[in-house]
Amino acid sequence: MTIIYSPEFNSTSYINLEQRQGQLLGLKVCGSTELLSELELRTGIIALEQSEPERLVAFHESLSKNVKGTIFEESFKTDEVGVARQLMVWTDNLLMAGWTPDTKVDSDKLMVLAKIVKGVVGKHVAQRWQDLTTYLKSHTIFQKDDVIEVHTEELIPAVIKSTLEQLAHQATVNYVVHEGQIPTDFKVFHFKTRDNAYQWYLSQPDAINNVDVTISSDNCILNDMAIAMGKPTVNSKSQNSNPQLLQLFKLGLSLFARPLNVNHLLSYLLIPGNPVGGVSYKLAKVLAKEGGVNEEWQKVIDEFDFTETNEKGEKKDKRQERLQFLMMMKKDYYAEGILVSDIRTYTENLAHWCDKQLRSPFTDDERKEQLVVLASFCRSLLLILPADGNISSELLQNHVDGIYRPQTFTHMKAQKGAPDVVSSITQLVDKAEKVCWLGCIGDSSAVYPFDFLNTKEIEKLQQSGITIPSKSVFYSKQHQMLLESLKNVHQLVLVTWEFDSNARQEEHPLITELKHQHHDDWGKRVINDEKPNLPIKKGNIIKLDPQTTYQLSDKMTSLKRENESYSSITTMIQHPFDYAVNYLLKLHEPQIGQLPDLDTTKGLVAHRFVELLVKKYGEQMAEDYDRIPQEQKSNLMADAIQQKGAVLLLPEYKLECQQFKSILDDSVSVLADIIQKLQLKPLDSEVEMNVNLDVIGEFKAEVDLVLRNPKGEYVIFDFKWSEGKTYPNKLEENKSIQLELYKEALKLHYGAGSKIAGVAYYLFPKMTLFTVDFPESDHIHHIEQKEENGKRVLLDEINNSYVYRRNELNKGMIEESEMTEISEIAYTKADTADDPLFPLEPDYNHDTLKGCPYVKVDKPPFVKKDGWKKNPTTNEIQANPEVIKEIKTTHPILKGRLV
């Protein structure tokens, strides 16, 4: 039996079978953990392996009992779990160095740590090594011809050294010292980006032919690219990974805090396979649309069918089981903090859900790894939480952050034909003729583990027989280990890159050292941006330019919406292709993963605030507004924000929210004054009108505010959160399809004889009413239309244009004609005095051409801003394709073919 040991080795370390004459049987490569398990197995010593969260809980329990009156007391009050974790790391390093709680050292810090360690329930790994050493003094577990081959002796912790010394009495323990020097036969292949380097490597260039082993520390992206290129994958692990499943722990518990973090709620609902079940997607969709939790949220829950079929084929109602993971949404924790019992209930349910998933035959191995960790997080929190009472959101967050840690999970396994890959140069057990170091960047040295000790404490420990290396000695040993490992290599190929995801990478110390040693011929050894060894396919690229017309299938010609809206009518007239794709085929770009932007959110909140005011105060809203107590206003505004703009409650928007509330209060006060000045009474807000228009047919209008004057005539106000000129310009040019159709809808909604006194846009940020129907006054801007605009009968134009486009659709043809001279388009030529059509909008870059949607292009990496143009010339594009900032496209959903 031969055991090969180094703290740096693991089961995937490189062994040269030819050098060892094929003696794989009876050979075992071990790191410290594997060696401990092997020795305990041979001795029959049974030691319960504690997970990291379990060890943390035990340490926290001992610390909480012993922290009073110590130097750690105040910091422990601030962050119990975080401090416990840090002190646990310190004691781990001390214990492995040979320190014990009984070591006599005149240091307050070390005496406190000793007291804490004595109170920890469970056996530390250092104690397990010490127990082994004691056992080996009187027991033999190896035969004389067994060999233990030890590498990197300088890095072996003291407690393990003691065990190895004892093993030397019953087996052959050889300490390997590498002969030779670091390789002089090397090349450096330098690339701009990691992707370029990986593509070159996977293309199997001549430079890496006959490579014995590849060193690569992060193979996840490498494997993704290998799959894309049809190459076999290698063993890979997601290092320091935060998979979505583990986020259930952090995100779920963050939902108990108030104000509610709506971004966290959206992320929680979008985690695949989350415990909320199928309703989560629908809730995420309504949350993204509404901007907060309101009656639409509850409507989804009430109407959702929670019936599920179990493994036996039985159907069961899972409503209660699923909704228990949203129980915090119905609680208000503002006043007295969060009930510990609620936290416990949620955490216990989440742990129980993990257990059920682990028992399911449909759960794959990768997910099981994550479920085990998630369950351990939950149970650790349950042990740390108080038995009952309340807990603040800050303390809960500290507990969660202290317990949660990124993990390492299996990503992919090596496939047949994959190269031999190790994660570090220190994992070369034997000599290798040719090695490729893929990703020789940055400084991967271990962090000095004794930074918490001062010089005097180190000296006192050494006087007690415990060797603590100084920082300089520690890093010197690390560097020496690197050089020793390189002696195993004859020919070396180093692959480096300058950027990884736009982040500039540091130079590896080895590159720095080699550059210094070989400065005379360094230029000959470095190859920059080597082209990948890929076959070149030649062919004509067919560019899909915007078309003049499109043919529709027979099925599409019969498609018709249940009801139209002003936005669908506008799209049909201006961009019939978009209408067909968006409204008939219902193909939209996915937007469920994001909440509305800030300006849209403010508009939603403003609408809801006015709606709540009208609902509460009715016709007296305008007269009463300035007399409403500030507390009542604040409560109504808070409700509006919670229901429609919860993102404003996030800490990062605190100042923005304060400014917004002030502007909204002032703006609604101005709106109330305008209503009184015009002698109007609010009738209703957010009025849904489903009517049948003469030409268009079924039509749905959502009117922001309907008012009435003393004559009983109706007035429409439409609210906008905008500071631009778009809406005033629509009125000036007599192009407001929205207000024109709303007038017709209102007449039908309120019955025959209904008269319209006027319509207007109210822009909240500008605190101004824009109208053509009411006279100029404070905060009322009367817009004068040019004579030719005022003479146009807008409703006739809209109806005629609708009929024109509908006839096109019925015939199976769409005339898009984007970026075509407007005067040459058939639609324009059909515009006559007898049958006027609504005018087409020109492109914002070209006044005479019909408008076209644009796709915004992200600035490519490494392209300077001044070289990135919005409207480059044809010559500029041919010279440098990267200068394009926007691309014209028939429809945004087709942008995948363009960018």
PLM features: residue spans?
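Accessory C-terminal helicase-associated subdomains
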Residues: 144-148, 304-424, 606-685
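RecB-family 4Fe-4S metal-dependent nuclease core
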Residues: 543-899
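Conserved helicase NTPase motor core
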Residues: 100-194, 420-427, 433-437, 606, ...
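ATPase/helicase motor core of nucleic-acid motors
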Residues: 17-28, 38, 43-44, 205-329, ...
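C-terminal accessory regions
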Residues: 468-518, 811, 816-847
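Conserved helicase core region in the C-terminal RecA-like lobe
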Residues: 5-9, 31-35, 148-152, 212-218, ...
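Basic/charged alpha-beta structural segments of nucleotide/phosphate-handling enzymes
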Residues: 9-144, 153-154, 158, 278-324
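Conserved motor-region signature of P-loop NTPase helicases/translocases
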Residues: 2-29, 143-259, 431, 898
